[in-house]
């Protein structure tokens, strides 16, 4: 098959085993893509010339194809033939936009190869003296070109790291060496099902059966997890953890050189027996880490737990849910864990009917569970309904004892399932204040921005030193034109006043990270915003450092390679780096 793609003349190795020649003609933006192995394929993404992916696994897989016996080789060949037939049949019908790689990984959503550390990067302006350490950001970066359905969230995890040491800056990016990635790299093609892009309808069931058949013959090993570790990052107990809610975290080290290295799956010394949500919360006062784990197959569908500052896990608290709920984020207050039980749920039986297992259940009532942090069971959880509320992310929550309320700040998204399922209605993400009355069981919700100021706000944070306590400001990505991010906003949560930092014409970024000047700053907004920015005209990327009080640009770091639009990040101080395990 041939394809029309845009923008540059390059050679690109999408996977270690397949080389593609891309012929770009400017300004017509037409590309002919030829596969020099045995198949032809297409992808509508602007791919950039970068070094080839390393063919040599950093971590030796527990199995090797060279050790397969005759029956395994025969089974592998037969199952590959079955999969090829399945893909051919699947591609006879148009893919929905939410599963079409030509949409999901187009332009600067397209993957990049790994980049070894590059030092002494050019800086414009002056980097504040208080910034010493490493800014790390996670994202989805598929190692192999998709052969069928693919959602942005399905990509392999890649961490981008910008290290600042006394004004000198270095950059690197590396795959997180998940069990999934290591096995697929050894096999030379993707075999693990993609949770969103592929697991829908009858073809999704067939893919699951194929995957388990490969497991029966010892061609893959899913006993050590299937996660992609592409969403969240947290530095806890002297470890940088890369996370996605489909697995336990992965421990990633920042090397003294500024490069990155995967240590491996981290289950907190065998204490964590289940998956863990990608947005754990660290209480800035106690130092405890709070987390959730959900299961889409069997009860309990949801569990809550915490870790002490030195990594000791509490017993699980089982949260009673009637159906498994999609729960990407949650919140904490000084005394409570705030659990959103919303209307986007998992119904695997929908696949039998030919549909998606992730659905918007209009008959379900959205609610929040308020669980005491030290609860040993769910007996004292308080449920408060909040009609038609779906927040993909919650930015903060706090208690107001004088009114018996918990205040939740989040971006309410409509249509609720638009990230996962194709919708005709335009997506809206409205910054909202939700007040949950623990005494009456009632709730209210209001938009924080005036109608004239309304913009989509998604991805961001408050000052993490104030997490779980009342905050005045939130720093959030301006998700327009969706799904791109044209800048970020500083919102006064008490007045609704909004100030914006816009990247400029054809320049887009991602999540803004707020970095306090120091932990003892008197003013909540005394610090800096760090954010990647990509220029789609020049195809160059940079790191911007913006004064959080004035929103004036303090410095930019020119990066040696393209940084795709990604997900969430954190900052590790130079002091914490020295204490890494």
UniProtKB/Swiss-Prot annotation:
Cleaved signal peptide residues: none
Tissue expression pattern: Expressed in flowers. Expressed in developing and ripening fruits.
Co-factor remark: Binds 1 Fe(2+) ion per subunit.
The entry's keywords: Abscisic acid biosynthesis, Chloroplast, Dioxygenase, Iron, Metal-binding, Oxidoreductase, Plastid, Transit peptide
Induction data: Induced by abscisic-acid (ABA) and dehydration.
Single Gene Ontology BP annotation: response to water deprivation
Domain of life: Eukaryota
Compartments where found: Plastid, Chloroplast stroma
Pathway of action: Plant hormone biosynthesis; abscisate biosynthesis
Protein's job: Has a 11,12(11',12') 9-cis epoxycarotenoid cleavage activity. Catalyzes the first step of abscisic-acid (ABA) biosynthesis from carotenoids.
This protein's name: 9-cis-epoxycarotenoid dioxygenase NCED2, chloroplastic
């Amino acid at each position: 098959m041939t394809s029309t793609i845009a923008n540059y003349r390059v050679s690109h190795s999408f996977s270690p085993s397949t080389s593609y020649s891309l012929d770009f003609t400017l300004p017509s933006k037409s590309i002919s893509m030829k596969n020099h192995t045995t198949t032809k394929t297409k992808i509508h993404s602007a791919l950039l010339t970068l070094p080839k992916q390393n063919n040599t696994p950093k971590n030796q897989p527990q199995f090797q194809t060279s050790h397969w016996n005759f029956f395994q080789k025969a089974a592998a060949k037969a199952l590959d033939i079955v999969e090829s037939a399945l893909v051919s049949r699947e591609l006879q019908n148009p893919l929905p936009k939410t599963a079409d790689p030509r949409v999901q990984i187009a332009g600067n959503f397209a993957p990049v190869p790994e980049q070894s550390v590059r030092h002494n990067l050019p800086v414009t302006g002056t980097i504040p003296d208080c910034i010493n350490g490493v800014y790390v950001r996670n994202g989805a970066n598929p190692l192999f070109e998709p052969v069928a359905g693919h959602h942005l969230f399905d990509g392999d995890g890649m961490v981008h790291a910008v290290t600042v040491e006394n004004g000198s800056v270095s950059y690197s990016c590396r795959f997180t060496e998940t069990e999934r990635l290591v096995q697929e790299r050894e096999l030379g093609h993707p075999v693990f099902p993609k949770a969103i892009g592929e697991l829908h309808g009858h073809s999704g069931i067939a893919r699951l059966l194929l995957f388990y058949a490969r497991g029966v013959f010892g061609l893959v090993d899913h006993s050590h997890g299937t996660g992609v570790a592409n969403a969240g990052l947290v530095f806890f107990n002297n470890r940088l953890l890369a996370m996605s809610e489909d697995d336990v975290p992965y421990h990633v080290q920042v090397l003294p050189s500024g490069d990155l290295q995967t240590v491996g799956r981290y289950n907190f010394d065998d204490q964590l027996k289940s998956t863990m949500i990608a947005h754990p919360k660290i209480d800035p006062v106690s130092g405890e880490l709070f987390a959730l784990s959900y299961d889409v197959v069997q009860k309990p569908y949801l569990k809550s737990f915490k870790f002490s500052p030195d990594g000791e896990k509490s017993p699980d608290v089982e949260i009673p849910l009637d159906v498994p709920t999609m729960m990407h984020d949650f919140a904490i207050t000084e005394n409570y864990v705030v659990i959103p039980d919303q209307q986007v749920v998992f119904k695997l039986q929908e696949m039998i009917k030919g549909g998606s297992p992730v659905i918007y259940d209009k008959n379900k009532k959205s609610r929040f569970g308020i669980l005491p942090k030290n609860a040993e069971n769910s007996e004292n959880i308080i449920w408060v309904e909040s009609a038609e509320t779906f927040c993909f992310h919650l930015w903060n929550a706090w208690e107001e004892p004088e009114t018996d309320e918990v205040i939740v700040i989040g971006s309410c998204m409509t249509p609720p399932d638009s990230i996962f399922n194709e919708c005709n209605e335009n997506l809206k993400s409205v910054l909202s204040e939700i007040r949950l009355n623990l005494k009456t069981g009632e709730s209210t919700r209001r938009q924080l921005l005036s109608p004239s100021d309304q913009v989509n706000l998604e991805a961001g944070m408050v000052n993490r030193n104030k997490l779980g306590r009342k905050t005045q400001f939130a720093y959030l990505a301006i998700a327009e034109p969706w799904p791109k991010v044209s800048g970020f906003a500083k919102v006064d949560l008490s007045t609704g006043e909004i100030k914006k930092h816009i990247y400029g014409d054809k320049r887009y970024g991602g999540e803004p990270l707020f970095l306090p000047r120091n932990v003892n700053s008197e003013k909540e907004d005394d610090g800096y915003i760090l954010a990647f920015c990509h220029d789609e005209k020049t195809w160059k990327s940079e790191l911007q450092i913006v004064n959080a009080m004035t929103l004036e640009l303090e410095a930019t770091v020119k990066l040696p390679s393209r940084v795709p639009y990604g997900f969430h990040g954190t900052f590790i101080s130079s002091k914490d780096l020295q204490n890494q395990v």
